[in-house]
């Protein structure tokens, strides 16, 4: 099954997440199909917290990809910010 989920990056105690489309059988930070955005929970000042390519997210969801609970909330927040 194809999922849209967070892949952790960044340094120790400084998380940074790529939002990726991946096969659910692959490791969390392993191989992915496409990177559709990022989430920076510790953004400071003018740094972006969230960037998502909503067109690509819609494409993958229409093709059967399931977003994880956290990513679904981030997608909802991104839609609200652009509207």
Curated annotation (Swiss-Prot):
One of its GO terms (molecular function) is structural constituent of ribosome. The keyword Ribonucleoprotein applies. InterPro entries: Ribosomal_bS16, Ribosomal_bS16_CS, Ribosomal_bS16_dom_sf. PROSITE patterns: RIBOSOMAL_S16. The keyword Aminoacyl-tRNA synthetase does not apply. Keywords: Ribonucleoprotein, Ribosomal protein. GO terms for cellular component: cytoplasm; small ribosomal subunit. GO terms for biological process: translation. Belongs to the bacterial ribosomal protein bS16 family. This is Small ribosomal subunit protein bS16. It comes from Shewanella baltica (strain OS155 / ATCC BAA-1091). The gene is rpsP.
